Regions:
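Extended, low-hydrophobicity, polar/charged segments
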Residues: 1-129
Length: 129
């Protein structure tokens, strides 16, 4: 269930796939939404959230924060995250493709709609290419 598989399935570019990643920032779970072709930079995630540090959540923390297994996390709903952050690069597309709660389901949305529904803050979250 990789971003690459998802891009192939819907016939879009990898950068239009939304990866939903849970980070633990100063003990609280946050959701970072990144393009499928980029890796999250933990230092940038921490900076965006105003936290001292950020680390990738462990699998059990992902489930606790979102109710979903790692790899199947949709951008919403995320009942126990304190905030959602969207990488600015995603906002440049007309349509992005998000996981919809399982590795087999995917939905296309405007990135502005994703940001609105999740009340996401736009930030630079990705490692330099």
């Amino acid at each position: 269930g990789s971003a690459r598989d998802a891009a192939r399935a819907v016939g879009c570019e990898l950068e239009q796939i939304v990866k939903s990643l849970v980070f633990i920032c100063d003990g609280a779970a946050v959701l970072a939404l990144l393009p499928g072709n980029r890796r999250a930079d933990a230092a940038k995630v921490a900076a965006a959230t105003g936290a001292f540090g950020a680390r990738v959540a462990r699998p059990e923390e992902v489930v606790a924060a979102t109710g979903f297994e790692p790899g199947a996390v949709p951008p919403f709903p995320a009942p126990h995250v304190v905030g959602t952050f969207i990488d600015e690069a995603l906002l440049t597309h007309e349509v992005v493709w998000c996981g919809a709660g399982s590795e087999r389901h995917i939905m296309g949305l405007s990135p502005l709609e994703v940001a609105r529904v999740t009340q996401a803050v736009a930030a630079d979250l990705a490692e330099e290419a």
